[in-house]
Amino acid sequence: MRNGLVWLLHPALPGTLRSILGARPPPAKRLCGFPKQTYSTMSNPAIQRIEDQIVKSPEDKREYRGLELANGIKVLLISDPTTDKSSAALDVHIGSLSDPPNIPGLSHFCEHMLFLGTKKYPKENEYSQFLSEHAGSSNAFTSGEHTNYYFDVSHEHLEGALDRFAQFFLCPLLDASCKDREVNAVDSEHEKNVMNDAWRLFQLEKATGNPKHPFSKFGTGNKYTLETRPNQEGIDVREELLKFHSTYYSSNLMAICVLGRESLDDLTNLVVKLFSEVENKNVPLPEFPEHPFQEEHLRQLYKIVPIKDIRNLYVTFPIPDLQQYYKSNPGYYLGHLIGHEGPGSLLSELKSKGWVNTLVGGQKEGARGFMFFIINVDLTEEGLLHVEDIILHMFQYIQKLRAEGPQEWVFQECKDLNAVAFRFKDKERPRGYTSKIAGKLHYYPLNGVLTAEYLLEEFRPDLIDMVLDKLRPENVRVAIVSKSFEGKTDRTEQWYGTQYKQEAIPEDVIQKWQNADLNGKFKLPTKNEFIPTNFEILSLEKDATPYPALIKDTAMSKLWFKQDDKFFLPKACLNFEFFSPFAYVDPLHCNMAYLYLELLKDSLNEYAYAAELAGLSYDLQNTIYGMYLSVKRYNDKQPILLKKITEKMATFEIDKKRFEIIKEAYMRSLNNFRAEQPHQHAMYYLRLLMTEVAWTKDELKEALDDVTLPRLKAFIPQLLSRLHIEALLHGNITKQAALGVMQMVEDTLIEHAHTKPLLPSQLVRYREVQLPDRGWFVYQQRNEVHNNCGIEIYYQTDMQSTSENMFLELFCQIISEPCFNTLRTKEQLGYIVFSGPRRANGIQGLRFIIQSEKPPHYLESRVEAFLITMEKAIEDMTEEAFQKHIQALAIRRLDKPKKLSAECAKYWGEIISQQYNYDRDNIEVAYLKTLTKDDIIRFYQEMLAVDAPRRHKVSVHVLAREMDSCPVVGEFPSQNDINLSEAPPLPQPEVIHNMTEFKRGLPLFPLVKPHINFMAAKL
């Protein structure tokens, strides 16, 4: 696999996305009060340098300008007259590595606190409320060296949003009352991660290096580091926050990216006006020239006990910081070869031995001054017994690379592939794009910031050899992760409690690895035959349609076709659903369908890896209705890959050894569900309760023992014997070619698997349980791993229809920001607080999801109290405020997809739901604009109020591991906080003891009727 890992700490902030669609975008609005100026000729003392020659993709129609402000801020401006959303991001080149040693997590805490009011806009939720009212959203993350803040907003409101945003860096309040509450949010965020193996392993890696190096710090922080210990030591954390912000939030460490409809000159004026006053404290850029892994930290073996039943091997080498060599990228070159998955690769050989299934190789970010090179594999049961041999194979492959020397043709192939990827780059969503660019501005020259991570320029064999020279046994660190080490460890990591044992790797083992000889099985990759060569953009056909058209409708298949008329890139999305009544008929068949496709993908991996490197990807998964197959990106070689996959599906022969290995890995993944987050458990149980047919993890585990190799071999022809295929072919493809592709898929299945069409009566659709009026049901379970509770409260409203969809979505839009502000920011229920629509099988409702240390019945009472406050808030809402919400939702719904795959996903969602409402957004927004405040109040009073006649409610309570029991409902009269709104008295709910009995006792909703007349849809 490809390179690298990224670790982020971020608060999930609320928000809404997307924007109003017009046949033609209105011209960019001028920003008030800014005279038109041409910056190429003018002089402005606030601007030190202007860079208008930004190298961009030939397909990129946006205009770019780089600035360096006099105060040192680097800026990239993007003018896109077609954008629905404007966006901005600011990246401060300071992160958790700069935390004071005695207050771990301070930079992350500072990131949280900046959202909670500024001198100019003191209201705690001013920023989030402004964004919510204008179809916007925001977030931030803290990493070792960066704190990155970003938002998006309806394009008309960039100036208002940017003004509020700029105050974070000019005059934040960092208010003491907010501080005490927000510590809980950081603590809840950490608590969410405590039992997550990825976080645990990351911190353990940091803890086992040089303890005096900033890399060893605990970046997230928690209540102990941000409140308890500082209080004990007489440290005023608010004073430390103010000091941290005033010290490090210096303009010379900041970079900004702004994207809007405005002209570059107007965007320049706006940024100068809002950010030129940020103070330059001339803070030296933190650098870390010493590596955290010194001689005493090398040749060490760490045996680590995970939470989940996983088996992994991590091999790490310290290497110098390669950032300055980005034009030749030696780490990328070596990662490409060591991480290759084709014939003759390291992975191929380790898989053939039955020791591993997957491999990741490449450079991993450290910080300014140091990096790592990693080779990580998962281990089979057999592989766990052969760790020394696996690492020997790694060194044999590295020795092969040394013997062969750097290959210019390999570098050239990487260079060519990256150049094609850059040339035909998809347009990114504004929010992610600005956030990413703001971070890059610290590392690359302004004119090359868009190309730097794509375009390779210089073949530098000397640098490749330099990095290769670091990949030696004397520099190695090895970590093995396995449940088999339980009870055999002698150390505990401080912050996450990870159990581990550290041993020096014996000298004779190091010597054995040093003597690694050439292994004749290893080969360098051959030339990639999947590299696209035909980039022709096909002209639109005469009968091209604005939405997918049904161009084939037979007993065997339905084919929907849409020629791309928006993006004009040499790409296509081919989506297929193979309906089979055998795929989900019982847990045994569900398991067999899963294993068949996992084994199929496993056997295709060597072949398909070259396609993936060449920008051609595929996906293959089992579904409750059968199998899903997609082939995406460059259309040139898609038919070749699709034919190979289809032939393999129809003629597949199972390898016995791979069957045993993949079955065992599947059993572990089923067992590992117990360690998922409490809120994920709540969502899982609700799906089981509400869907007509859904197999539990326990049922699947029990049935897995019955899956034998002969049984699976017999199942495959049964699965393929009768199918109905529904497909969407969308992109740079003609109608004739689409028909040809569909025919090829059908012919292959008929020829090799003797596939026949399904009978119409075999096309089963699962339905949703219909709750009774005024019914309230509670289902309780315990999470055995996490010490947090989780809850999902679901108010089922009705079947999906234009009117019902808009009632629900508008109500969700109105309550979204207040919900987050009330339940998370003010009441501090937990880090994860979510409200929004839930939709399944054509039925919908309002849901709340919370994860908290507080008990579920308390969370339930707070949600009910919040809903009552929202009724009054809507009643008191001005017409202007109500219309803002309608507009925000309309903008979000009409936001144009930024790339072909996103547009295709919308259409595919309509096909999979069998609703086929391809013009849904326009139809529903037209209805939305007719709604009144009274409509929403009526909707609330009829469906959601405590005494509503058509209230239908299910609550799933997931208890923390240390809670033996908990009442399902309770009153909380002794609340200390007088500001809490009063919770209503709740009736006693019906407790669900048996899911099957619960579902048997209730009717099912009918299926939603398709939006379209199939006879009229045919071309």
From Swiss-Prot:
Family, as annotated: Belongs to the peptidase M16 family.
Gene Ontology CC annotations of this record: cytosol; endosome lumen; extracellular exosome; mitochondrion; plasma membrane
PANTHER family for the chain: INSULIN-DEGRADING ENZYME-RELATED (PTHR43690:SF18), NARDILYSIN (PTHR43690)
SUPFAM superfamilies: LuxS/MPP-like metallohydrolase
Motif (SlyX motif): 853-858
Name assigned to this protein: Insulin-degrading enzyme
InterPro entries according to UniProt: Metalloenz_LuxS/M16, Pept_M16_N, Pept_M16_Zn_BS, Peptidase_M16, Peptidase_M16_C, Peptidase_M16_M, PqqF-like_C_4
EC number assigned by the record: 3.4.24.56
Function, as annotated: Plays a role in the cellular breakdown of insulin, APP peptides, IAPP peptides, natriuretic peptides, glucagon, bradykinin, kallidin, and other peptides, and thereby plays a role in intercellular peptide signaling. Substrate binding induces important conformation changes, making it possible to bind and degrade larger substrates, such as insulin. Contributes to the regulation of peptide hormone signaling cascades and regulation of blood glucose homeostasis via its role in the degradation of insulin, glucagon and IAPP.
Binding residues for ATP: 429, 895-901
Residues the record marks as active site: 111 (proton acceptor)
Modified residues (N6-succinyllysine): 192, 697
